[in-house]
Amino acid sequence: MASVTITSVHEPTNPLAVAHTGEREVEGDQLIKTDTNNDNDIINTLLNNFLYPQELKHNVFVPRFQQRITIVKAWDILSLSTSPPNGTNGANGTNSAPHRPKDLHILDIGCGQGESAVTMAALLQPHMHGARLHITGIDTARPDYGTPYTVAETHAHLTASALGRHISFRREDAAAFFSPSRLSSPSPPGSWPSAANVDAVTLCHSLWYFPTPQSVADLFTTLAGARVPRVYLAEYSFRGSLPGGQQDAHILAARAQALLHASVLEKLSADSSQQNHQGREPRPRAPNVRAALDVGSIVEAAAAAGWAVRRQGTFVPAADMIEGHLEARLVVKDAFAEAVRAEGLSPEREHEVLGLVPGVKKAFARLAAAGVAKGRAMDVWWAELER
């Protein structure tokens, strides 16, 4: 089970919020250590609704969905639907009549193949009690992107599944989704859900894939302009809390990939014939990690657009989450060095990127010497933002 640390000035209020196992006061905020409940039934539901290769079920998709369950529970999005209206609990402490949940429209930005969207549908819908739930996933990836199943194939499978009535997908970015024409147009009866009635935006392991720090800053500005009430984030933190450097390989490999991406963009920006490089599709050799802002940079970009952290926390991914290990293995392969050299970077930049590779190899060597076969994924940071 994943241990979750939450720093918050607001108590979770819904049945999906992770269960408390102990707490202490820290500088006026509340630090709550929590453990996930048994989520096997939810995972089975997700697997029954998702399109994936059976041979990757236990090694990839079970831990991937478990991580998203942990994130969605920590986010506590359901409180937006189930919290009673202001003033229903009087000063004398008496409770009002049971509050009927309100409709909930969530925009999942950078939804990929839909893992986070379907996880929210499976977790939230049983608690809506007659209110409507819809998750709109948006992504700019090509429909034929992905293997062995493409984005188009997984989206079609999801929308035709038992949870599909709560999910839809669009190929566009946040600026297009929240275009002035959509926001300014009157919402006729029956238009729910629409861009004008988004209750929350989620970014689940998607900010790292934005091309530049400026594109992340622009996103927060767009969300502020659209008057989105809440934004929920989850991203790797570039930090590891496990002893013995178990997460070092993932951290260093991610830095190497991010530096490669930044170096390529720097080179392209200097080439007048490539002025529109930021809008193009990723290169076939492009690393999975792109801008990869750290936590402080994400919070700073959000704050510049008027967003403040309402709640935040961290957790260590489960031991069977191998995606960090796979990212690190990619960097130590000869193919990564060959790809770096093929980019035609300046000698200084090439040396800087490749100079991070020995550190990843040393991290693996230390683990091997300790009898550890695989590196662990770095800590995940999540947050709830408000304006």
Curated annotation (Swiss-Prot):
Region spans: Methyltransferase domain: 98-223
Alphabetical UniProt keywords: Methyltransferase, S-adenosyl-L-methionine, Transferase
Pathway given in the UniProt record: Mycotoxin biosynthesis
Enzyme nomenclature, EC number: 2.1.1.-
SUPFAM superfamilies tied to this protein: S-adenosyl-L-methionine-dependent methyltransferases
InterPro entries recorded: SAM-dependent_MTases_sf
Molecular function GO terms recorded: methyltransferase activity
Gene disruption: observed consequences: Does not produce N-methylated compounds phomopsin A and N,N-dimethyl phomopsin A, but accumulates N-desmethyl phomopsin A.
Gene Ontology process terms (BP): methylation
Family: Belongs to the class I-like SAM-binding methyltransferase superfamily. Erg6/SMT family.
Function: Methyltransferase; part of the gene cluster that mediates the biosynthesis of the phomopsins, a group of hexapeptide mycotoxins which infects lupins and causes lupinosis disease in livestock. Within the pathway, phomM acts as an S-adenosylmethionine-dependent alpha-N-methyltransferase that catalyzes two successive N-methylation reactions, converting N-desmethyl-phomopsin A to phomopsin A and phomopsin A further to an N,N-dimethylated congener called phomopsin E.
Name of the featured protein: Methyltransferase phomM
Organism field: Diaporthe leptostromiformis (Lupinosis disease fungus)
Gene symbol of the encoding locus: phomM
